[in-house]
A protein has these predicted regions:
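Ordered, amphipathic secondary-structure segments that act as subunit-interaction surfaces
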Residues: 74, 83-93
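Helix-start/capping segments and mature chain N-termini
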Residues: 1-76, 94, 102-281
């Protein structure tokens, strides 16, 4: 089941949106964000909506709704589903007109709420990708823009062709940036490490939340330059992201790993946080 808020009303199903000559489809000026509803909570929904507005502005468009209004719209959509359903909440914006640059006065918007079960935390495998994340000099890396995901899709497709679920992507100078679909964490001797944000990947909202929760629980967390060798030699590797929240990595290249105590604590802390309030804030 899915509902979409378009043109001031909710529509059920999967309606067509973009015209044949739309700037969004032609030049790729589409931005979106993703939040989750599950078990009756919507953790960090306010932060996802605020990032959506920033992403729209970063691509030279104009969001027709303020962040607080997006929160209310999202919750309105969530209430159309049974409380126990796991949902994906996705605001999206694009420009209809413009040539190279979008015309901000023609910014279009849709907010989608769809049934989307959370992935089971069974673990995933990953290999090193031959594709790299772009730098801010060549792409709008500060925005959650659809144009970035063709590169992530190439990395994921390459990994699946080799028999892996996901890929570790490096930044332009060869340091680890993230997984193709989520932020990357590793643990070594009980200490947590994660690549420092350097404008080549999104400093994820779930990533920031997990860092704060782990530090609050007494863990030492270092945001630093991470090499692929660090990942290969880690005791634990796990991912954070809106779609799957906190998930363990069970194989890096040919090295098998077990979900460890740091991962387990991170997931436990995140679920406790998510249930701490109606929006997890």
């Amino acid at each position: 089941m899915q509902f979409h808020f378009i043109g001031g009303r909710w529509v059920e199903g999967n309606p067509p949106l973009i015209t044949a000559y739309s700037h969004g489809a032609w030049m790729g000026t589409i931005v979106f964000d993703g939040a989750r509803a599950f078990e009756g909570v919507t953790p960090d929904l306010d932060r996802h909506c605020a990032r959506m507005v920033r992403s729209v502005e970063a691509l030279g468009m104009r969001c027709p709704y303020a962040a607080g209004e997006l929160v209310e719209l999202a919750l309105e959509g969530v209430r159309r589903f049974p409380k126990e359903n796991a949902l994906y909440i996705r605001p999206m914006a694009w420009s209809e007109d413009g040539f190279m640059a979008p015309d901000p006065d023609t910014t279009q918007f849709v907010l989608s709420v769809v049934d989307s079960p959370l992935p089971k935390p069974n673990g995933f495998s990953a290999c090193l990708s031959s594709f790299r994340r772009p730098g801010p000099e060549v792409a709008p890396t500060e925005a959650k823009a659809a144009c970035h995901y063709t590169n992530s899709g190439r990395a994921e497709r390459e990994a699946k062709g080799k028999g892996f679920d996901n890929a570790v992507m490096l930044d332009p100078i060869g340091n680890v940036a993230e997984f193709a679909t989520a932020n990357l964490f590793l643990a070594k001797d009980g200490v947590v490490h994660t690549p420092v944000p350097n404008n080549t990947f999104l400093n994820g909202i779930t990533r920031q939340r997990v860092i704060k929760l782990l530090r609050g629980a007494g863990y030492e967390v270092h945001e630093r330059t991470v090499s692929f060798r660090d990942v290969l030699e880690a005791d634990e590797v796990f991912s954070t992201g809106n779609y799957g929240k906190v998930l363990p990595t069970t194989r890096i290249e040919q090295r098998h790993l077990q979900p460890g105590p740091v991962y387990a604590k991170a997931r436990e802390l995140y679920w406790e946080f998510a249930h701490s309030g109606p929006t997890g804030s």
